[in-house]
């Protein structure tokens, strides 16, 4: 199983479909939502493998479960929540960061 950590970004709906097409039934997507807003502007995928949660909520911890059980942990945007999550991982966990243009432009230009 692959754990994907995502934010409400325009490219994520397409990304979810691509991963599920390439590796069906082997993906769990966490979409971080703003606790004040409780909904997304861009991602509207209604599938059992897509979860909309606030980081560190009880629901988040239950959905993620045992991090050592994942074949891959894939970061789709390096935000505050994903950084905090990475700091909690035990040694030896493989993490892949898929960088996209928005991250580069926002942080380095």
Language-model segments: residues:
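N-terminal subdomain of nucleotide-sugar transferases
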Residues: 1-44, 70
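Short His-Asn-centered micro-motif
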Residues: 5-7, 33-34, 75-78, 99-100
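Short beta->alpha connector loops
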Residues: 8-12, 56-57, 77-81
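Short glycine-/acidic-enriched loop or helix-start segments at secondary-structure transitions
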Residues: 14-16, 83-87, 107-108
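Short, conserved loop/helix-junction motifs that constitute active-site signature segments
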Residues: 22-25, 87-93
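Conserved nucleotide-sugar phosphate-binding/catalytic loop shared by glycosyltransferases and other
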Residues: 31-32, 36-60, 64
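Short N-terminal targeting/anchoring amphipathic segment
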Residues: 63-82, 94-98
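Acceptor-binding helix/loop patch of EC 2.4 sugar-transfer enzymes
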Residues: 101-109
């Amino acid at each position: 199983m692959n754990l994907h950590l995502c934010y409400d970004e325009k490219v994520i709906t397409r990304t979810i479909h691509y991963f599920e097409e390439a590796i069906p039934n082997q993906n769990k997507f966490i979409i971080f939502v703003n606790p004040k807003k409780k909904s997304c502007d861009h991602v509207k995928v209604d599938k059992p493998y897509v979860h909309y949660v606030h980081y560190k909520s009880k629901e988040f911890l239950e959905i993620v479960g045992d991090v050592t059980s994942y074949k891959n942990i894939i970061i789709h945007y390096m935000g505050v929540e994903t950084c905090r999550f990475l700091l909690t991982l035990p040694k030896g966990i493989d993490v892949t960061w898929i960088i996209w243009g928005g991250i580069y432009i926002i942080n380095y230009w």
